[in-house]
């Protein structure tokens, strides 16, 4: 009875019932709330009450005036351990108080209702910022978690925000799965939690208290043992739901204006060897219902632009079960692929990069030396040479090492480039050494994550590595950023940058990290494009700049990267002779602009909706004879185009009217149609039309071919308008 009272007080509907004006009606059976839900909530309430008392005592003992620096130089006074960011937002404007989702205090993300402790720089985050969206969607995942615990008796595993929404992984037992028919009920319960405007309450708990709170959740216990390295960690309460989370979160669930659950699927805990199969439900949410409607309209447009659909309709590529995780590029798709690679090769030549070719198959000794065998082994394909009878590594007494005869397909090029740098003595006069490689890579992604061109087992990258002196680092980073801007502007992408700094378990000297992060930050500030700071999100071997490009529908994609590496030069003992004659260690920069060429091609297909710009297009020109009598001349025109290296087709189906054939060419997204009749044949000319049905009139054949070549070489996005 006590649980039911708490349930009603917190705004939850009683399980299995719905309220009616005249009577209560039994719905389809819903699992009784698990016993641990009330036990955990009771312990949370005890710990929360104790924390409130500690905070009140702290306020009395340490209350003092502190200075808060706001953006644009404004400063205000506040009371330590008392004033919250939300209270300051109310003082500034009611609009800010209503739209802020979290705060940033001295670079740290902060709950709006968490008291400020000392002098600080304060910035408010709204849904419009990437950080604000992450907070908003993380809180939405917690709402879904509360609904899943209530309705399904779920054991929660993880519920992160993503670049395009959120998802929740949870366990229902070995036999139970989530059905798509259950999503509307889950969504309704989420909406009831939102309507109740339940507060998110932040609690700091000791490791012992954490174990007690989550004693019935072995997933959380595993995370506590593995990830909680300090004496305390944070949990958040939302209604009766309690979850382990760093936060921050929204002030209350009522800030979520609209929430929609999208898909249900299965997921794995940790690895394919784990016995538990998790259930995953993904969703999206917004501060206002209007934003959800706009998103749904964009989603419908995105479905029409799905690269898998375009690839099939335009005969660009296909997939086959006999080669999972790999793409078969047909002639038209190969044309686009090669044009992208040629574009990057031209930039390499202009920017002083040297293209190299390295093997695909290496002894695992290389990967042990680089550290990938220890940290990345689960994502690598390994095999034994024919005729060897070595013991499988999984059966040996040393699982971290592999027998001498074991080989592995390379998942990245950097170790091979280190071998290439080290194969002969180097001088400071050679630096920087910029090595570029389009070598085939293989990564063993989980089969469930494979989908179209976005995630493959076999792919190629515009992968390059720069070996430079520390004094050259700043100039090289500026060059990498300029490379990004040049390529993305041609491809029609806007982009956002994020600087990820040292994580807790970083390797190397702190002063080297300080210097490198300072160089990256200064380069970003001078670059002038939008960027944000991701504290602690760098790789263990160096800070990085992540590049998030935005396509024509405004969707983010992470493709390019600029990564500093302090460890590989040490692991491979890379040296060059410095100006004083002493050996010195180079700095290594990993960088990619397109990232996976396959993935970028898929992003481009969806961004342009299959209407390829001329320089990429596999449908540059179709030649259409008016009558059968002009078919020979039409073939002559086609041969002239092909001789110039342009892509051309011939539509000599004179059984259809001219207007039907022109319309067919426009629907197929041919950039240009060259219509040839008796007059054009006599004048050695063509009548030019565009895919947007602009009639450009009669032009000389040689002149038209030359103009197409000029527009193709310039890589303009609007050749039809400039012709």
From Swiss-Prot:
The modification Phosphoserine is found at residue 57. Disulfide bonds: none annotated. GO terms for cellular component: mitochondrial matrix; mitochondrion. Gene3D superfamilies: 3.10.20.30, Anticodon-binding domain, Bira Bifunctional Protein, Domain 2, Threonyl-trna Synthetase, Chain A, domain 2. Keywords: Aminoacyl-tRNA synthetase, ATP-binding, Ligase, Mitochondrion, Nucleotide-binding, Phosphoprotein, Protein biosynthesis, Transit peptide. It is found in: Mitochondrion matrix. GO terms for biological process: threonyl-tRNA aminoacylation. It comes from Rattus norvegicus (Rat). Its EC number is 6.1.1.3. Residues 64-126 form the TGS domain. This is Threonine--tRNA ligase, mitochondrial. Belongs to the class-II aminoacyl-tRNA synthetase family. It holds the Pfam family tRNA-synt_2b. HAMAP family: Thr_tRNA_synth (MF_00184). One of its GO terms (molecular function) is aminoacyl-tRNA deacylase activity. Homodimer. It is an enzyme of class 6 (ligase). It comes from the Eukaryota. InterPro entries: aa-tRNA-synt_IIb (IPR002314), aa-tRNA-synth_II (IPR006195), aa-tRNA-synth_II/BPL/LPL (IPR045864), Anticodon-bd (IPR004154), Anticodon-bd_dom_sf (IPR036621), Beta-grasp_dom_sf (IPR012675), TGS (IPR004095), TGS-like (IPR012676). Catalyzes the attachment of threonine to tRNA(Thr) in a two-step reaction: threonine is first activated by ATP to form Thr-AMP and then transferred to the acceptor end of tRNA(Thr). Also edits incorrectly charged tRNA(Thr) via its editing domain. It catalyses: tRNA(Thr) + L-threonine + ATP = L-threonyl-tRNA(Thr) + AMP + diphosphate + H(+).
């Amino acid at each position: 009875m006590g649980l039911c009272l708490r349930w009603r007080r917190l705004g939850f509907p009683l399980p299995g019932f719905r309220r009616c004006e005249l009577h209560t009606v039994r719905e389809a059976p819903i699992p009784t709330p698990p016993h641990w839900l009330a036990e955990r909530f009771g312990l949370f309430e005890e710990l929360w009450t104790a924390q409130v008392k500690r905070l009140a005592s702290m306020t009395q003992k340490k209350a003092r005036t502190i200075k808060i620096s706001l953006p644009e130089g404004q400063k205000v006074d506040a009371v330590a351990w008392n004033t919250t960011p939300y209270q300051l937002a109310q003082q500034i404007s009611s609009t800010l108080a209503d739209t802020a989702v979290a705060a940033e205090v001295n670079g740290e993300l902060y709950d709006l209702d968490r008291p400020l402790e000392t002098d600080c720089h304060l910035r408010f985050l709204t849904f419009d910022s990437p950080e604000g969206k992450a907070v908003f969607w993380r809180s939405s995942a917690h709402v879904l978690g509360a609904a899943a615990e209530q309705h399904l008796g779920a054991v929660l595993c993880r519920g992160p925000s993503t670049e395009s929404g959120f998802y929740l992984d949870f366990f229902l037992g070995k036999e139970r799965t989530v059905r798509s028919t259950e999503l509307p009920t889950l969504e309704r319960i989420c909406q009831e939690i939102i309507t109740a405007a339940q507060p998110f309450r932040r609690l700091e708990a000791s490791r012992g208290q954490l174990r007690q709170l989550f004693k019935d959740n072995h997933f959380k216990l595993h995370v506590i043992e593995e990830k909680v390295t300090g004496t305390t960690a944070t949990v958040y309460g939302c209604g009766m739901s309690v979850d382990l989370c760093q936060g921050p979160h929204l002030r209350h669930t009522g800030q979520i204006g609209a929430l929609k659950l999208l898909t249900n699927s299965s997921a794995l805990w940790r690895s394919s060897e784990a016995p538990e199969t998790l259930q995953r439900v993904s969703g999206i949410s917004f501060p206002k219902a209007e934003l959800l409607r706009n998103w749904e309209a964009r989603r419908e447009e995105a479905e029409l632009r799905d690269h898998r659909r375009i690839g099939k309709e335009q005969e660009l590529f296909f997939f086959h079960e006999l080669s999972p995780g790999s793409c078969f590029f047909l002639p038209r798709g190969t044309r686009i692929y090669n044009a992208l690679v040629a574009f990057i090769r031209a930039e390499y030549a202009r920017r002083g990069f040297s293209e190299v070719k390295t093997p695909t198959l290496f002894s695992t000794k290389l990967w042990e030396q680089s550290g990938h065998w220890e940290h990345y082994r689960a994502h690598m394909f390994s095999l034994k040479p024919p005729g060897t009878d070595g013991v499988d590594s999984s059966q040996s007494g040393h699982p971290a090492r592999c027998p001498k005869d074991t080989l592995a397909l390379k998942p990245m090029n950097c170790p091979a480039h280190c071998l290439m740098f080290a194969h002969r003595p180097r001088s400071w006069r050679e630096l920087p050494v910029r090595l570029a490689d389009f070598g085939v890579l293989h990564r063993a992604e989980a089969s469930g994550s494979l989908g179209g061109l976005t995630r493959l087992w076999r792919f190629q990258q515009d992968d390059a590595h720069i070996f430079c002196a520390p004094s050259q680092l700043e100039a090289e980073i500026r060059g990498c950023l300029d490379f990004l801007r040049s390529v993305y502007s041609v491809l029609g992408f806007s982009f956002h940058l994020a600087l990820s700094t040292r994580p807790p378990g970083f390797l190397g000297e702190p002063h080297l990290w300080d210097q490198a992060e300072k160089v990256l930050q200064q380069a970003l500030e001078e670059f002038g494009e939008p960027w944000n700071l991701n504290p602690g999100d760098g790789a263990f071997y160096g800070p990085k700049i992540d590049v998030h490009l935005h396509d024509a529908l405004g969707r983010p994609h992470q493709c390019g990267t600029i990564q500093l590496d302090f460890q590989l030069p040490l692991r491979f003992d890379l040296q060059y002779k410095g100006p004083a004659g002493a050996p010195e260690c180079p700095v290594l920069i990993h960088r990619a602009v397109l990232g996976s060429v396959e993935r970028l091609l898929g992003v481009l297909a969806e961004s342009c909706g299959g209407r390829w710009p001329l320089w990429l297009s596999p449908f540059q020109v179709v030649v259409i004879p008016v009558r059968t009598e002009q078919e020979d001349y039409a073939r002559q025109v086609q041969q002239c185009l092909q001789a110039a290296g342009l892509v051309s087709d011939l539509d000599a189906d004179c059984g259809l009217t001219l207007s039907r054939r022109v319309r067919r060419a426009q629907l197929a997204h041919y950039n240009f149609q060259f219509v040839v009749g008796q007059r054009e044949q006599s004048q050695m000319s063509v009548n030019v039309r565009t895919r947007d049905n602009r009639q450009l009139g009669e032009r000389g054949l040689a002149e038209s071919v030359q103009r197409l070549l000029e527009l193709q070489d310039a890589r303009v996005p609007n050749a039809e308008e400039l012709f």
